């Protein structure tokens, strides 16, 4: 990782020089947003969807993005760091004003960075991931809109650290008692040939949007809705989606999840979804 080249504020630099200052509001106040796009076999996947979400998130948090050619930067990063299966990170965060006053937000400069690094699955050995439905609470949309990506993972981290001993990760609920998402992934439920995923208090992930595409192109039904914890026991199958793991099996996955994985892999090679680098 230390020998990678990144991009920050108009320059290509060693990745170790692309991060925030410890005084930056993006670091001490989570005043930042980001997005992560996968590269499969040297091709960017769902570039427009990731960029559109990144731009929308930056607008939501009032972080002014520079006028840059994103694809050009990605191609140069890929040229300098030729990793065929990777992540591209887009990041923007608020720096600190000369006054140092945390209320002097308007005078804090905006920093923008991008970098590429090797990808990793949710579980290194590719085995199903064991997921626990936690009674921990996800931050509500009424506090800040969870469809805008943010750096505030504290509720995920806290509950991940106290998960059951036989589980790899957790899914949180909201204050109304509905299932939301896990740290870095959406959750999908298969029940009676329908696919359900949470509607509120969660990120609407790009990978889950590809699952929705699969259902539109094939005889399957997809619905975003409020999901009670009972579904955890009723569902025929449970799967996870993320930019890092694509469609990932859990201890509750079966043939439908395997079919979704096959369809997803097809799309990682399809011209409608990929961009040449």
Regions found by a protein language model. Name each.
Residues 1-76, 98, 103-277:
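Helix-start/capping segments and mature chain N-termini
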Residues 79-92, 99:
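Ordered, amphipathic secondary-structure segments that act as subunit-interaction surfaces
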């Amino acid at each position: 990782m230390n020998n990678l080249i990144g991009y920050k504020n108009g320059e290509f630099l060693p990745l170790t020089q692309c991060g925030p200052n410890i005084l930056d509001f993006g670091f001490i106040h989570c005043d930042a947003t980001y997005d992560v796009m996968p590269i499969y076999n040297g091709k960017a996947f769902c570039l427009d969807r990731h960029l559109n979400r990144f731009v929308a998130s930056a607008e939501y948090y009032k972080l002014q993005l520079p006028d840059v050619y994103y694809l050009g930067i990605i191609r140069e990063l890929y040229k300098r760091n030729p990793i065929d299966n990777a992540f591209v990170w887009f990041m923007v965060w608020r720096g600190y004003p000369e006054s140092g006053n945390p209320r002097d937000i308007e005078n804090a400069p905006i920093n923008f960075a991008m970098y590429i690094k090797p990808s990793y699955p949710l579980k290194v050995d590719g085995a199903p991931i064991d997921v626990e439905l936690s009674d921990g609470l996800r931050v509500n949309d009424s506090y800040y809109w969870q469809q805008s990506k943010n750096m505030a993972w504290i509720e995920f981290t806290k509950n991940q650290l106290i998960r059951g001993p036989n589980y790899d990760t957790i899914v949180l609920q909201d204050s109304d008692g509905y299932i939301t998402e896990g740290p870095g992934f959406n959750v999908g439920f298969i029940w009676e040939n329908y696919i359900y995923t949470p509607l509120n208090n969660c990120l609407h992930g790009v990978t889950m949007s590809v699952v929705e595409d699969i259902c539109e192109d094939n005889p399957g039904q997809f619905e975003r809705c409020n999901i009670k914890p009972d579904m955890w026991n009723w569902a025929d199958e449970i799967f996870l989606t993320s930019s890092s793991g694509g469609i990932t099996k859990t201890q509750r996955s079966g043939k439908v999840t395997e079919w979704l994985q096959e369809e997803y892999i097809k799309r990682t090679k399809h011209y409608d979804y990929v961009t040449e680098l």
